[in-house]
Regions:
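Hydrophobic core of transmembrane alpha-helices in multi-pass small-molecule transporters
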Residues: 13, 92-110, 215, 294-311
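Helix-loop boundary and gating motifs at the non-cytosolic
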Residues: 1-53, 205-247
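Transmembrane alpha-helix termini and helix-breaking/packing motifs in multi-pass membrane transporters
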Residues: 28, 32, 144-165, 230-234, ...
Length: 396
């Protein structure tokens, strides 16, 4: 991989380290203050909506300046989010919607910049290696950060949350400085979203299959992003246990990403994604019998093994389809925007369903059933991604 690719790995590693330190506990923080699942739902719904809007805005701006600025603006928005949470203290749940919007803007800008730069610094020959290596680094950061966060919060509770959010600010600042080493690449060809939008709806295109797969993946991600961690706190009453849970999951995920990056080659992507999606869905089933720390650990370990099997081939295939499209280099930002819009539509639908569920009844059994239902969408995502007919299919 090139030096720019390794630099992107370092920046995303710092970003994931900061989010693993704080985002792991943000939903637990809101839960502890108000103990309402609906508050968490509105916070995450606002976050998903803002992410989609941020991607479109970032795509428009990137064609008038450099895509590195999207990365930086995303990290600066994270800094603003945590500063605001620190200022609001125990009043944070009352501002769940604006806080969710601010965090969503940060995530949208960062991941837009990351995905466009990923396309620029990789190619079909090294994309699987990059995604595997990046997954290893992210998992390594995910091992240490939640453990530190859980330990700090476990010692001092709400004061510990302040320490955790403050540390994240420092890490985001370091990542922002490091982004100055990324090579600029401005685009002056304008923002051509309409042709990519049409391709997304045209059922005979490979891109349509990618879009459906992304929407289905978003259905799973929307509720999993916050509910599992909160269930650990509900089941144990301990942020320290949540930190242990996240660390154990990341440790297993580290090994899984290593294996996937080494052995899952283009001609094995379809099978790997399908196996990963089935295993991820099966990992949720013990929760239907009982929501306890033990069954949540089964879910965490199972997902840590399965998700790299799913996400590495799916991500690589999506970018290969973009790379094979007409005007791929010119329109890469538009393809990234549409990909993330599909993901966020899935997330919004998932969280909206969660809000309807908790408005009707709040029971752990129903929440576990909803996790199982949304997780099964990964199987559909794997099957649809297989229909995208990537370039390696012709070589088999």
């Amino acid at each position: 991989m090139s030096r720019q690719a390794w630099l992107l790995v370092a920046i995303s590693g710092l970003y994931v380290g900061a989010t693993a330190l704080s985002n792991t506990f943000v939903n637990a923080y809101l839960w502890k203050l108000e103990r309402k699942f609906a508050t968490l739902g509105w916070f995450n719904l606002a976050q998903s909506v803002a992410m989609g809007l941020a991607f479109v805005t970032a795509g428009y701006l990137t064609n008038r300046c450099d895509r590195v600025w999207a990365l930086r603006l995303g990290m600066l928005a994270h800094v603003a989010f945590y500063l605001t949470v620190l200022q609001l203290e125990r009043h944070a749940p009352a501002y769940a919607l604006p806080l969710g919007l601010l965090l969503g803007v940060g995530m949208g800008f960062f991941w837009f910049g990351y995905n466009v730069i990923l396309f620029d610094v990789t190619d079909p020959e090294n994309r699987d290696r990059f995604n595997g290596t990046n997954g290893l680094v992210m998992s390594a950061m995910g091992i240490v950060a939640p453990l530190v966060g859980g330990w700090l919060i476990g010692r001092e509770t709400f004061a510990g949350y302040h320490w955790v959010f403050g540390l994240s600010l420092c890490i985001f600042a370091l990542a922002t400085v490091l982004s100055g080493l990324l090579r600029p690449r401005a685009d002056a060809d304008g923002f051509h979203l309409r042709p990519v939008w049409r391709a997304s709806w045209s059922q005979h295109t490979r891109w349509h299959a990618v879009m459906v797969a992304m929407l289905l993946e978003g259905l799973r991600e929307g509720v999993f992003a916050f509910l599992v961690g909160v269930l650990v706190v509900v089941a144990t009453g301990s942020e320290w246990r949540l930190g242990l849970y996240a660390t154990l999951s990341s440790l297993v995920s580290l090994a899984s990403y290593g294996v996937v990056g080494r052995f899952v080659k283009p001609h094995r992507r379809r099978q790997a994604a399908l196996v990963g999606s089935l295993l991820a869905t099966a990992s949720v089933l013990p929760l239907l019998a009982e929501v306890s720390f033990a069954t949540l650990v089964v879910l965490g370990v199972g997902t840590a093994i399965a998700y790299p099997l799913f996400i590495v081939p799916v991500t690589s295939t999506a970018f290969d389809v973009i790379g094979a499209a007409p005007h791929a280099v010119r329109d890469r930002t538009e393809y990234v925007v549409m990909r993330e819009l599909a993901l966020n539509v899935g997330r919004v639908l998932s969280v909206a369903g969660f809000l309807l569920l908790v408005a009707w009844r709040e029971t752990l059994t129903l929440l576990a059933a909803y996790l199982a239902l949304t997780s099964s969408a990964l199987v559909g995502a794997a099957l649809w991604m297989g229909r995208s007919e990537p370039e390696w299919k012709a070589k088999e």
